[in-house]
């Protein structure tokens, strides 16, 4: 029984190490509006995915009513617009994202969020034009066991399937995706 438990623990640690090795923070700096900024790289299925975003602090504010109001477009971070760069096509639900650089927005809600992928890049985070949308995909909402004081965008992998995570406050918005 002990040997079996050790094998299971070893497998879990190996999976965690593989996921951690595939994702790394490559840059941290202060943004133009005062929030720290982070650039995360993630490699999966032969694709290199990079997300650069501002990481505002919650500071006792409420996510869905004060900072990222439910049903309204949100810059998904702070300061400059959040960018996604991929060297391979990605599929979030039925939304196909070709290789390239895009701006990410979200539409938060209490039970589900929308991921909004815009073809417009290089703008300040609040400059949004719906006619520049590549498309939208559903994000599932989960409750975090411990609140995230800062916006955190990360990737996880389970059974070879990658997932995008956006954490803030007690909310985690997630979407599995595929590389094409």
Residue ranges and their predicted role:
Residues 73-123:
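Mid-length scaffold segments of soluble, non-membrane domains
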Residues 13:
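Structured alpha-helical
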Residues 6, 98-100, 105-108, 152-160:
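Short, surface-exposed loop and linker segments with low hydrophobicity and enrichment for Pro/Ser/Thr
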Residues 1-10:
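Bacterial N-terminal signal peptides that target proteins for export
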Residues 1, 22-23:
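Absolute protein N-terminus
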Residues 17-19:
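N-terminal signal peptide c-region/cleavage motif recognized by signal peptidases
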Residues 23-72, 121-180:
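Primarily secretory-pathway and cell-envelope proteins
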